[in-house]
A protein has these predicted regions:
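N-terminal amphipathic, basic-rich helices that act as targeting or association modules
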Residues: 17-25, 31-39, 43-46
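Charged, compositionally biased N-terminal leader segments and the immediate start
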Residues: 4-18
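Conserved small/polar residues in nucleotide/adenosyl-binding loops
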Residues: 30, 47, 197-199
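Duplex nucleic acid-engaging cores and interfaces of nucleic-acid transaction enzymes
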Residues: 99-116, 120-196
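Secondary-structure capping and boundary motifs in well-ordered enzyme cores
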Residues: 19-23, 43, 51, 81-88, ...
Length: 199
């Protein structure tokens, strides 16, 4: 029945919507909650986290499937939007880029409000000497033992990188030789560390 409807030249696709683009609009509404002044500030951070995690899953599952379909080159069209997989990917990219930009702006806004309440993210250069010392001890005890640096080369081709694992890329120089390395940060390593000196 649906195939017959697709073949009908009079079918108006403006009454239906691509599932992926519809989902992105839903996730945008989640993001907009983080920009509401009447929402408690830590709840706004939570909405930012939910929005970002949702997009991670979206790219892993839905975009991955559409990309695989695009490699088949059979001109299959979506039954709701009449878009090919390539066209869907283009539309997704057009919608996602502004969302990430908006996410970053909202995060900067929330971070400033937190800083006004004496809650702020600090770079290593901003720490006091005693804080740096305690942080170094924490790093050597809790982080360094679980790191596994990899230098990419002929003997070590680029490895499979698991989803949702933070990877740090490094350009390594030794005399005239330049190489590339990566360090994966395991999920159980804390991304944020409270200033131990003030606890």
């Amino acid at each position: 029945m649906m195939e017959g409807r697709m073949m009908n030249k009079n079918y108006d696709f403006s009454y239906t919507q691509d599932r992926e683009l519809s989902w992105l609009k839903f996730n945008e509404r989640v993001l907009r909650e983080a920009d509401k002044k009447n929402v408690p500030i830590f709840e706004r951070l939570k909405f930012l986290e939910i929005f970002t995690n949702n997009l991670d899953e979206f790219f892993m599952v839905r975009v991955g499937s559409i990309h695989e379909m695009s490699l088949i080159h059979d001109n299959h069209r979506d039954i709701r939007s009449d878009l090919t997989p390539e066209e869907q990917l283009d539309e997704i990219a057009k919608h996602v880029r502004p969302l990430y930009e908006l996410r970053d702006k909202i995060f900067a806004k929330v971070s400033k409000e937190l800083a006004d309440k004496k809650i702020k993210r600090c770079q290593i250069e901003e720490l006091e000497k005693e804080e740096k010392k305690k942080l170094k001890t924490y790093y050597e005890a809790m982080i360094l033992p679980v790191l596994s640096p990899i230098v990419i080369g002929k003997q070590h081709p680029f490895p499979h990188i698991p989803n949702k694992i933070l990877q740090i890329g490094l350009i390594l120089k030794k005399k005239e030789k330049i190489s590339f390395g990566i360090i994966g940060l395991p999920k159980d390593v804390e991304r944020m560390i409270l200033s131990l000196i003030h606890i």
